[in-house]
Amino acid sequence: DLCLGDPDWMPHPVIYMGKAISALEKFLRRRFPDTQKGLLMAGAALAAILPLGSFLMAAAAIYLAGLVHPVLAFLLETLWCWQALAVKGLYTESMRVKKKLEEQDLPGARSAVARIVGRDTQNLDAAGVAKAAIETVAENFSDGVAAPLFYLVIGGAPLGLCYKAINTMDSMVGYKNCLLYTSDAADDTPCVD
């Protein structure tokens, strides 16, 4: 991942997880009452369905690929292990911020850090830009490198993709609403940070 990153032309599991989260959220909102208890139950259902589904689909695909040829199973698992990590993107974006700060290009540094943080960067001074970048790199290293690597080591691509599903739920809807309170809590449980 550090050498190649995630090529734009290659389908990425997180994109499909995101689509599944959006579809499941809509489906579950229609099926559960619009009360705090109903939304928590829907959140619990989503927090169970997506990670378990990601794990089972990956495990089944690798198993079926192995029936065709063991090398095919190895290649598929290798591809998904690669896609579960986010080393190059994190490195590239953080170095862009560093370069702009070294050039004393504060507007450029603000713009660069805005690509990796989820907050307003327009009023940050140089120290604020550096702090935002450091905080984001620390969190994203945990979410994009350390935790996925941990789960890949103990459970291969299926468990690595299960973790990515949990993390993607948290990123998309974990802080947005009551429905995904459970997804936010699920993201905090498997982290190794």
Spans of model-derived segments:
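A residue-level signal for conserved active-site and pocket-lining positions in enzyme catalytic cores
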Residues: 1, 24, 109
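Conserved small/polar residues in nucleotide/adenosyl-binding loops
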Residues: 1, 181-188
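Hydrophobic alpha-helical membrane-embedded segments
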Residues: 2-8, 72-99
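Divalent-cation-assisted or electrostatically stabilized phosphate/pyrophosphate-binding catalytic cores
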Residues: 11-28, 179-183
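Multi-pass membrane catalytic core of lipid/isoprenoid biosynthesis enzymes
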Residues: 26-58, 115, 129-142, 147, ...
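Long, highly hydrophobic alpha-helical transmembrane signal-anchor segments
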Residues: 42-87, 158-161, 165-174, 178-179
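Polar-ligand-bearing catalytic/cofactor-coordination segments
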Residues: 85-142, 146-158, 168-178
